[in-house]
Amino acid sequence: MERMKQPGEEKNMYSIAFYEKENGESDVWDFLEELREKAATNKDARIQYRQITLYIELLQNNGTRQPDNITKHIEENIWELRPGNNRVFYFYYENNTFVLLHHFRKKTQKTPQREIEQAKAERNDYLRRKEAVKK
């Protein structure tokens, strides 16, 4: 079962899908759920949750046509959302869908190469499994 946010009436131009590992885990979905649960009693979690969900909505409504402080192209077709110190990797998939891959908390000026490589591996896994379903 793929977790997906569908575009509303005329409001959203794009759909958002959450990458899931073969075991069904979704890093971004699980992180958002964790923040949502903590938000009732933790101000930092509440702020992070609001920021990340706002940035996902901006992506859903506007795609990648946004300032670098909101979304940034990393390499190939890997992009990142940039809410606060959090980063959420994603890529564009067919039918106006963006697939959210994984998140990490940024601690250095430059995005760590291992995070980029993980995003590429997740993208490739997603595409491989989608192609297998089509056949």
Please identify what each model-predicted range represents:
Residues M1-N85, N95-T97, R105-K135:
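Basic, Lys/Arg-enriched alpha-helical interface segments
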Residues V88-F91:
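Short, surface-exposed beta-strand/loop micro-motifs that present aromatic residues
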